[in-house]
């Protein structure tokens, strides 16, 4: 088979380079998830003969940030072999034993701890390292069936895995914020080499991706268009269920509090979910408020939750950081099993603003979909932790950093509902946590609407709403074709703490509308980007999260590309009968559409119909779609000024209900600010926490291996209401 090159030797060399780099990369990944790996240097290193293996390792380590760690680690067990497969086998076997030993030591540390929060943090680390090992196993298998013409797909998966591993490591360390004793320092030292090796592995795969992109090999760079196909893991029965009206659905299990199903609680039902199956398993959760804490474990893949509507089926909890629980562990619902789908359900945390960080849902599942769902909380409501996620026609409510995490997530036609925070707290909406510039993660808000509850609108002058702030150094958020109300101040974005992340973040606004959409007075940090047409395309669902391979076929309205102008699109809408016969705007993608005073009628879908819902669909979805949103919301909160017509979803017509954010920092962050707007609270361990110390590496440099350089674990410091005040860390 020809790959576009005449020289057979050149082809052979390129193939060898790819296999070699992939193999050594895997070794790095294996070692990276090992806590306490030791790097032993040879006493006679000066006399060591430079072998073929050493030369190969030096070449592979060239693009990394921590070259010495890279070379020393790979040479430790490589001996004189230069066979990539043997290197992989040796490293894999040695690492599995190392991880087993570390697990035993971690358990011993847990048993010796007197501080309950420290015990919880150690348990959290143990869980997260286990997830990383699971990802490694899948990667090892993927590499075992290596196919040259599919290497680009393999690289995408490896980048996703490495990005998630960085998130796991950082979340482990974040859990020790506010703990007593030396457990946190012990784990930080043990993880130092692992953190460095993970960043090194990501550097290798990124370098390889760039190299392959320049090669322009047709067989590798061509991708099948899957918009008319169903994902490989979606069986025919599941497709029928997801596209059928609820009255016709015959789920595998029914949960009903009134006794009309097989089980009365969700956790009872989960005991009967098949483990590690490749077929979809559907759970119908009937109307009711389910006060239980639910975790969809890693083994529960291809699971579907279908409710009776986000105003009827509610999963409710109230755990909070203030109660002595790590932010990670406060989640009412945790989704870990890949290929998860939820429709017509509400997830809530009722702890309130006074309790600081309190997560309604934490999502780690790759290729997860949420349609017509509601996420209610205050600080840190939706924890989009890691991997690829897609949200359509959902409502997310909160005060501070209520959309945070390090996932690659697209929110299409969703409503961001700002709630009343504590006194003098500002309300930053997003707090993305990217730690490495090479991570394939970030938040994309496409065709969304920002609105406020009436209680918030009453204090919007004192508590401003911001589009977001940088939780970690390389925070990335793109907002496009979205309605931005008047309670978002002209500066738009809020700093985390001082100058932290302002040079290295990646924020961009594209063709937004509404009275707060003008960018002429936005902050001018080095990290604010003006994207070209070509660059914008990279952040659409089809390219950014490879959505064409797994979103179509679910009955979920899905726009795979760009909207034209203020919400119109010439892209295909798959999985629904919604039309996209709108004209293309001549505006440049980086141009802001002149804000209109009312939200556009005809947004592509609407959020849930619960009292806090904000948008009601102007266009009804066809019966039988995956949880088509109810047509009549019981209560509508709409923007004070309406967004331009043509948005992907429009708020209700009642302008008075739209609440604009105030300048105060969000209530409930770990370390809520004092009543004085200018006061700054030290960041806590939660997701949006401000840095505990100045980063050891300049923001413009690559992330330091030392965990202490990053901001606190979760947004735990509430931002001050005053724009001039340094925001306090609030994710924690």
UniProtKB/Swiss-Prot annotation:
Q: Where is the region Pectinesterase 28?
A: 252-548
Ranges annotated as biased composition (Low complexity): 570-620, 633-732
Instruction: Give, as in the UniProt entry, the pathway in which the protein acts.
Output: Glycan metabolism; pectin degradation; 2-dehydro-3-deoxy-D-gluconate from pectin: step 1/5
Question: Where mainly located?
Answer: membrane
> According to the UniProt entry, what is the EC number of this protein?
3.1.1.11
Q: Which SMART domains match?
A: PMEI
Ranges for region Disordered: 570-732
Tissue note: Expressed in flower buds.
User: Which molecular function GO terms apply here?
Assistant: enzyme inhibitor activity; pectinesterase activity
Name a biological process GO annotation. pectin catabolic process
Matches recorded under Gene3D superfamilies? Invertase/pectin methylesterase inhibitor family protein, Single-stranded right-handed beta-helix, Pectin lyase-like
Tell me the keywords, alphabetical order: Aspartyl esterase, Disulfide bond, Glycoprotein, Hydrolase, Membrane, Transmembrane, Transmembrane helix
Q: Name one GO cellular component term.
A: membrane
Site positions for Transition state stabilizer, renumbered to this chain? Answer: 379
Which residues bear sugar attachments? Answer: 40, 93, 278, 297, 413, 566, 570, 581
One Pfam family matching this protein: PMEI
Q: Where is the active site?
A: 380 (proton donor), 401 (nucleophile)
Endpoints of the signal sequence? none
Could you tell me which residues belong to the region Pectinesterase inhibitor 28? 51-204
Q: What's its catalytic activity? A: [(1->4)-alpha-D-galacturonosyl methyl ester](n) + n H2O = [(1->4)-alpha-D-galacturonosyl](n) + n methanol + n H(+)
Any stretches that span the bilayer, and where are they? 17-37
Question: Which positions bind substrate?
Answer: 327, 357, 469, 471
Q: What else is known?
A: The PMEI region may act as an autoinhibitory domain and prevent untimely PME activity during transport.
User: Its biological function?
Assistant: Acts in the modification of cell walls via demethylesterification of cell wall pectin.
Which family does the entry's similarity section mention? In the N-terminal section; belongs to the PMEI family. In the C-terminal section; belongs to the pectinesterase family.
Q: What is the protein named?
A: Putative pectinesterase/pectinesterase inhibitor 28
Species per Swiss-Prot/TrEMBL record: Arabidopsis thaliana (Mouse-ear cress)
Q: Which gene is this protein's source? A: PME28
